[in-house]
Amino acid sequence: MKKNKIIILKNGTDVFGKKIEILINEEIIEKISENIEEKEFLNKENVKIIDVEKKLIMPGVIDVHTHMREPGITYKEDFETGSKACAKGGITTFYDMPNTVPATTTLENLLNKKELAGKKSVVNFGIHFGGSKNNNIDEIRKVLEKKEANTVKIFMNVTTGEMLIEDDEILKGIFENSELVLVHAENEMIDKAIALNQKYGKGLYVCHIPSADELKKVIEAKKNNKLNNEKHPIFAEVTPHHLFLNEKIRESNERNKMLLRMKPELRKKSDNEFLWKAINEGCIDTIGTDHAPHLIEEKMEKVTFGMPGVETSLALMLTAYNEGKIKLPVIQKLMCENPAEIMKIVRRGKLKEGYYADVIVVDTEKEWIAGVDDTLESKCGWTPYENWKLKGKNIMTIVNGEIVYEKGKINENAKKGKAIEFLK
């Protein structure tokens, strides 16, 4: 009879500073306590006991906003390289956006993308379905009815790919037929997205909010919904680059002028400060990377929008923690718990008995230099934070009970990640 594989994490600390030990049985967290007796497990070949030496144990990060470039643009990134970059950065589940080639705007394309990710990704994955300017309402209905996805992403401003939707009838159809709509909406398009949310009573997730002015609109709408007891929630996402970078940094040298370009563009330092304030006042729901890699040659040749982000997102937030800008429980809420709750992901996002064992071990004291002291896993091979001194680093990633990343290396023998399940 096959013996279950057991991992025991000893002498850890949780985000509240309490001692924590975790027993993982196969792919499930079986027990969490301050002290797990290991006597019965000693000298058994199917058991791995790891003393994490008081380091931080967290649920794996869930990044609901990535562009893994597969299918169709795989010279920039693919599900294998992108997922390895995730594992290194402490991300155990990513969601991929629909603006690939072909776009994820039909059930067939969605199923093909899921199959590709299932064969190649070393972490768990979800796929956002895409709304189309060619009116794919029938496909949206089909996908949602078959429970192959539970979110629809739309682009209300120009960005990478040909997915801008300007037709009000198509937007109406998408909001009428979806439960949660993710929007790329900038400036006055945020007003339009909020109006659609309020008119059709469906959930709205506003991606990568870059500025004080735009965030104020979302905060106001959230308040109004709460006051009116409305059941159609609005969620606010910010990215690490809109927290840590700004126009001044971009314009500081010729290299940055080319590399630090994305949609929405970087804003002022005062916008950085407002976003941080909003985080600490509980106005932000998630941190999403908007990982959108391009080769450095492309970036330096002409203005190309998008940057890699999954390898540095957690480390940047830990650096902010070490600088007193944010507390550890807030990081866990924004990067693990809230994404799982908003996307209705089954049994992930928390350290909880009976949940999948998506667990990371973090050294909050580790000082390192991004792009210098480590080997980048992303196919694009660069980071916008090169030479930044960071404090705090993921040192172990466990996905579904498998150690996928440890001691600076990807475990090439680990099982592949799973397609996420969501509440039906």
What are these regions (language model features)?
Residues 356-421:
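C-terminal cap of metal-dependent C-N hydrolases
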Residues 55-120:
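Metal-associated gating/positioning segment near the N- to mid-region
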Residues 1-43:
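N-terminal metal-binding scaffold of metallo-dependent hydrolase/deaminase domains
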Residues 60-71, 156, 182-185, 289:
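Histidine-centered catalytic micro-motifs
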